[in-house]
């Protein structure tokens, strides 16, 4: 492509500060921005980023259709919510208008195994209008490509086991309570674990209705299976309490969590495949003890066994850089809803983004 890639930013919160700056620094340009927050609408995106004005004002998301029809951008970056149903509006709008889109929405990483109906609708609309929709972010490398690359150096695999942890203290009281922090193990079982205790048949019915709420790893396991050419025969999810052997004080909950009570939870997803490789991954959210920190740990078990650990990852920056570096792959991909498992491996971009677009 012999001109700059034209990008629209949908959602101008914390993530957009990085995605927009990275877009400019990779030789592309932001031509439009949208939000629903009245405190942001009307501001120049430079003000949002904390830099000089760029001459692009954040507009009300309700005007997105009209503005996108006028702007005709190459791609839209959507950085708003975590469930595919919550980003349906901007993604479907892009699909209808023939605009490529990439989102940080965690479920969008591989939504076909958690909301197949909506994924199919987005896929059909994008195919009809010759554009590509996908999801990317931190998991593209650290829960995905990193593991598939290690698999490439392994003779025989029997199991892939992964975990990623985060401190619920960093995300507010609603998330801490949703993770069962502060509950006795008995109450945790009643209020948290029992919600996801169902048969495979019942879970499948909920998925087929588009009403399932997956943990982040649910979609990651599906992505890994596709990337590695595995055939999924069953997948289950359970919530397991996390505990500590001494009392912990939670500033978010403003309470002392007794030793042995739940400090949070792990959502464990187990995938069995026809090829007899088991993928077991977990997302651990809990109140940290003083010596604990964010950690991403994956093991490939077989011949040989290999474990890789990423300590204290800069998740926000890595997420946003992955999104921006993926832009040429999205623009070069076939039309439809295309998971990044079906795209080339994510690469560092040392030239302007347009030079990678075919």
Predicted regions and their residues:
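N-terminal glycine-/serine-/threonine-rich beta1-alpha1-beta2 phosphate-ribose binding loop
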Residues: 1-96
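Active-site-lining helix/loop region of Rossmann-like oxidoreductase modules
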Residues: 6, 10, 14, 152-286, ...
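Conserved active-site and cofactor/substrate-binding residues in soluble primary-metabolism enzymes
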Residues: 10, 14, 18, 71, ...
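Short, ordered loop/turn segments at secondary-structure junctions
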Residues: 36, 81, 105-109, 138-139, ...
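ADP-ribose/adenylate-binding Rossmann-like module
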Residues: 78, 82, 94-114
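Rossmann-fold NAD(P)-binding glycine/threonine-rich loop
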Residues: 106-130
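Adenosine-phosphate binding glycine-rich loop
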Residues: 129-158, 165, 320-322, 326
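C-terminal helical cap and adjacent loop that interface with cofactors, partners, or active-site loops
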Residues: 286-358
